[in-house]
Amino acid sequence: MFENKKVLILEGGGFKTSFSAGVMDAFQMQAHNPFDSYIGVSGGCIAISYFLSKRYGYFYQCMRTLCQDERFVKYSKAFTEGLMNLDFFYDIAYKEFPFDFQTAMQSLKGKEYYIVLTNSADGATEYHQPTLENWVDMTIAASTVPMLTKGKHVVNGIHYSDGGISDPVPVKWAVENGATDIVLIRTTHHNFKPSRLRPEYFASKFIRANQKIKDDVENFQNKIKESIDYIDALPEHIKVDQIAPKVVLNSNIFTNSVKNIELDYRTGLEAGLNYIHSVKAESSMLKTH
């Protein structure tokens, strides 16, 4: 599937994906798109959608708008509809910062894009290629976490939840399907360590879904650490370039402010530009030898 292809993978992270928005805008700014395949997890799917749509700055501006609107995050709705109102997010996205789906489909000609989803019935991970007709529904489903959002979303008659629940960093899946050249954009910092003082651990205690999803949400951070350890242990012929913040980001999954989003976005923008510079420097060095 991914043999001889350059694969771009984006981790999710709620408002932490303002970092990813910065990286992707740096890529757009420098017309850097050598990728053959894209894999999106949770909010990473939104970043990829705007990137493929060639909507520079839209995801960043959308998050700035949402964090200032009390209708998006409501603590009073945590046990009924979820902390974050995803339907409101897509209403804002459509009206003020719309995707250009025709351009996105054009960008994917000869390429492939997979959205990571968790089947709400059995907790299994599924990897789907969106069509023009179901792109929005798949992206909503990919960001739907019990308690933090409404919990599940229907796509083609099947209930799905956030793919990050079951596979938050799908490098192993990519490698198992032939990938040897991967760029991973993370929202967890370089020295990430699991902690129980996190919203997803708290949320797991109130989930009434099947036991696998409950366990996966509770162990979400351990699964990220396992993925990082897996990457570190890969053989030399499998290349994984990681673009990640050096320290903990200012934003959290659902806690936010315009200042924090701007800081994380600028950190991502700088990280993206630095990565492109390093790629060009490496390419230039190879040409001279």
Language-model region placement:
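Patatin-like phospholipase
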Residues: 1-38, 49-289
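Catalytic nucleophile serine of serine hydrolases
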Residues: 42
